[in-house]
């Protein structure tokens, strides 16, 4: 299927679009992560970015993609409440891989938000959703528009949570192609790749964190906990970036 034809999927009605996406997802399911990335870089629209939280295992997708497209813009959404270790990790990886890092954040500073709304993360699911919208969803939407993004690479995996278990390799959201190259990777495969390529993990991994977001809504992974329960007090898994 040619790049020209794929770009024009957005012009089709929903039924035809879904049929083509189903065919492409079947194709991608037989590819390795490296092959999916190569295919996407060649066949999907060329205004391409990847997003990264610079979390526990973020190095894997960064490494896979920059081997093939070193200058790809890497979008980071900075809430202002990341762990100090995360900010240091961002600096370290940016220097190590010469990342084309693009940082976006809310137009309202964290201090001003607290003055205006209080600690939203302490106000139940509605407060958390409002917080995520201000600090993550709105900045990401601005980034996608500012960079005229057509193709978005992300590192979501099926085994990270129930909400991600049925995600496809390729989807179209608001006219943007979204590709998930390591969707079918297991935790063991992630660990093996990190070890084989001598890659760094987030500094908090050795302190018992399996997932890292904001300081106030992230817990250590305790025995018996699901990974998704370490975020947002177990009330939800997604921050909103990958829900719509």
Swiss-Prot record:
Its EC number is 1.8.4.8. GO terms for biological process: hydrogen sulfide biosynthetic process; sulfate assimilation, phosphoadenylyl sulfate reduction by phosphoadenylyl-sulfate reductase (thioredoxin). It is found in: Cytoplasm. The active site is at 239 (nucleophile). Pfam families: PAPS_reduct. Keywords: Cytoplasm, Oxidoreductase. It catalyses: [thioredoxin]-disulfide + sulfite + adenosine 3',5'-bisphosphate + 2 H(+) = [thioredoxin]-dithiol + 3'-phosphoadenylyl sulfate. GO terms for cellular component: cytoplasm. It is an enzyme of class 1 (oxidoreductase). The keyword Cytoplasm applies. GO terms for molecular function: phosphoadenylyl-sulfate reductase (thioredoxin) activity. The keyword Cytoplasm applies. Pathway: Sulfur metabolism; hydrogen sulfide biosynthesis; sulfite from sulfate: step 3/3. It comes from the Bacteria. Belongs to the PAPS reductase family. CysH subfamily. Catalyzes the formation of sulfite from phosphoadenosine 5'-phosphosulfate (PAPS) using thioredoxin as an electron donor. This is Phosphoadenosine 5'-phosphosulfate reductase. It comes from Buchnera aphidicola subsp. Acyrthosiphon pisum (strain 5A). The lineage of its organism: Bacteria, Pseudomonadati, Pseudomonadota, Gammaproteobacteria, Enterobacterales. The gene is cysH.
């Amino acid at each position: 299927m040619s790049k020209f034809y794929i770009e024009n999927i957005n012009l089709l009605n929903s039924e035809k679009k879904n049929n083509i996406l189903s065919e492409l997802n079947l194709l991608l399911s037989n590819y390795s992560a490296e092959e999916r990335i190569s295919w996407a870089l060649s066949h999907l629209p060329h205004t391409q970015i990847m997003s990264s939280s610079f979390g526990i295992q973020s190095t894997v997708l960064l490494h896979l993609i920059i081997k093939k497209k070193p200058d790809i813009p890497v979008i980071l959404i900075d809430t202002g409440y990341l762990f100090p270790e995360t900010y240091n990790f961002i600096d370290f990886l940016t220097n190590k891989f010469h990342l084309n890092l693009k940082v976006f954040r809310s137009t309202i500073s964290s201090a001003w938000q607290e003055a205006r709304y209080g600690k939203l993360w302490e106000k139940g699911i509605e407060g958390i959703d409002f917080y995520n919208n201000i600090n993550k969803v709105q900045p990401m939407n601005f980034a996608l528009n500012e960079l005229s993004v057509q193709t978005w690479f992300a590192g979501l995996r099926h085994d990270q949570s129930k909400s991600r278990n049925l995600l496809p390799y390729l989807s179209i959201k608001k006219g943007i192609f979204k590709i998930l190259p390591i969707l079918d990777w297991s935790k063991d495969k992630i660990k093996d790749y990190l070890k084989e390529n001598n890659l760094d993990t987030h500094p908090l991994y050795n302190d018992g964190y399996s997932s890292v977001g904001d300081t106030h809504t992230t817990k250590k992974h305790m025995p018996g906990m699901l990974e998704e329960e370490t975020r947002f007090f177990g009330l939800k898994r997604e921050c909103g970036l990958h829900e719509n």
